[in-house]
C-alpha cells in the first residue's frame, strides 16, 4: 500500500518569476491554504513507512489526476491512498484496468462520506501526511533556492535521497 501526495511548490517572488518564465511555471490556487501561488507542484508516491518511492514536478495548474498515472509507472503497489485532489471516477477506472485500487477520501459535504471515509485508512494517511510535513519543516521544500526547472528537480532529488537514507540503518 502506498500514498499519493502533492505539495504546492514555491511562492516565487517577483525576481524569480522572470527566472522561471520560460520553464513552464504558472499560477494556481491552493484550496487548503486559500491562496494563489506561482510555481510548480511536487507530486510524490510514498510508502506507508514514509519512504519516497517516486516523485514528479509539474506546472502549478496541472490537475493532480494527470500526474497520477506517470507517478505509478514501474511501481507494484496495488492499493493507493490519495488526496482529495485525485478524486476522479475516470482515473479510478483507468487505474483499475492496470491493477491498481485507488482510494480517495470524500469531502465532508459529499453524500456517503461518513460511510466511505474509513477511520483506519484516514489514520494511515495522517501518518504519511506527518512524514510529508517533515520534508517541509526539515528541508524547507516549499522555498527552493534554484534558478531553473532542471535545478529544481536536481535539488528535490538530492533532498529526497537524503530523506530516504533515514530508512537504511
Regions picked out by a protein language model, each given a short descriptive name:
Residues 32-35, 145-156:
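Structural motif
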Residues 44, 129, 161:
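A residue-level signal for conserved active-site and pocket-lining positions in enzyme catalytic cores
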Residues 51, 163-169:
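Short helix-capping/linker segments at secondary-structure and domain boundaries
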Residues 65-68, 132, 158:
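A general structural signal for well-ordered alpha-helical segments in protein cores
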Residues 79, 84-150:
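Helix-centered, glycine/charged polyanion-binding patches within enzymatic domains
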Residues 135, 153-162:
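Charged alpha-helix within mobile-element recombinases
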Amino acid at each position: 500500500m502506498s500514498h499519493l501526495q502533492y505539495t504546492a511548490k514555491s511562492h516565487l517572488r517577483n525576481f524569480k518569476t522572470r527566472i522561471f518564465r520560460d520553464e513552464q511555471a504558472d499560477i494556481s490556487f491552493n484550496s487548503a491554504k486559500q491562496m494563489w501561488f506561482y510555481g510548480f507542484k511536487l507530486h510524490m508516491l510514498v510508502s506507508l513507512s514514509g519512504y519516497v518511492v517516486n516523485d514528479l514536478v509539474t506546472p502549478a495548474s496541472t490537475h493532480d489526476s494527470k500526474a497520477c498515472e506517470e507517478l505509478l509507472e514501474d511501481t507494484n503497489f496495488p492499493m493507493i491512498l490519495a488526496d482529495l485532489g485525485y478524486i476522479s471516477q475516470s482515473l479510478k477506472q483507468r487505474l483499475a484496468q492496470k491493477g491498481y485500487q485507488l482510494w480517495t477520501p470524500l469531502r465532508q459535504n459529499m453524500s456517503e462520506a461518513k460511510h466511505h471515509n474509513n477511520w483506519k485508512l484516514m489514520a494511515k494517511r495522517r501518518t504519511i501526511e506527518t512524514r510529508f510535513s517533515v520534508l517541509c519543516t526539515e528541508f524547507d521544500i516549499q522555498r527552493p533556492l534554484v534558478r531553473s526547472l532542471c535545478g529544481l528537480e536536481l535539488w528535490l532529488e538530492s533532498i529526497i535521497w537524503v530523506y530516504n537514507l533515514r530508512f537504511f540503518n
